Amino acid sequence: MQCNINDIIKILPHSYPFLLVDRVIECDPGMSIKAIKNVTFNEQFFIGHFPGHPIMPGVLIIESLAQASAICVLGKKTVENKVVYFMSIENAKFRKPVTPGDTLILQSNFEGLRLGVYKFKCVASVGKEEVAGATILAKLQDK
């Protein structure tokens, strides 16, 4: 499954300026996803993070990964009228700054479901270089 921005807007409840996934390159719904966030200088967070040395906040990289994971879950045909709520992160690591002009590659792999909580192993990369990673826990809820 691939998605453009128009498809993503229909899947996720987020909107500008907090929609942080631009395109889905590939997705095996419920199992794995590879998506893109194009990081541009026009992002509002660059106004104050940091003037003269813009860096994408790590928490927003994690949020991008959480949104990609939500698309992975919500892409299943058996899931309708639901929303995915981010519950927690484990083992978050930030390895390299993400700056304007970077294409952030978001990869998320389903690792399990326990008591209604989805577990995803996530990695964000620029090119072939890993810039961040975390384990994300999320829960599916009615809209």
UniProtKB/Swiss-Prot annotation:
Membrane-spanning ranges: none
EC number in record: 4.2.1.59
Coiled coil regions in record: none
Active site: H49
Signal peptide start-end: none
Class of the enzyme per the UniProt entry, highest EC level: lyase
One Gene Ontology term of the molecular function aspect: (3R)-hydroxyacyl-[acyl-carrier-protein] dehydratase activity
Keywords from the named record: Cytoplasm, Lipid A biosynthesis, Lipid biosynthesis, Lipid metabolism, Lyase
InterPro entries attached to this UniProt entry: FabA_FabZ, FabZ, HotDog_dom_sf
Annotated compartments: Cytoplasm
Catalytic activity: a (3R)-hydroxyacyl-[ACP] = a (2E)-enoyl-[ACP] + H2O
Major localization listed first in the record, in broad terms: cytoplasm
A Pfam family: FabA
Key word Acyltransferase present: no
A GO cellular component annotation in the UniProt record: membrane
A GO biological process held by the record: fatty acid biosynthetic process
Record's function text: Involved in unsaturated fatty acids biosynthesis. Catalyzes the dehydration of short chain beta-hydroxyacyl-ACPs and long chain saturated and unsaturated beta-hydroxyacyl-ACPs.
Family, per entry: Belongs to the thioester dehydratase family. FabZ subfamily.
Protein name (Swiss-Prot/TrEMBL): 3-hydroxyacyl-[acyl-carrier-protein] dehydratase FabZ
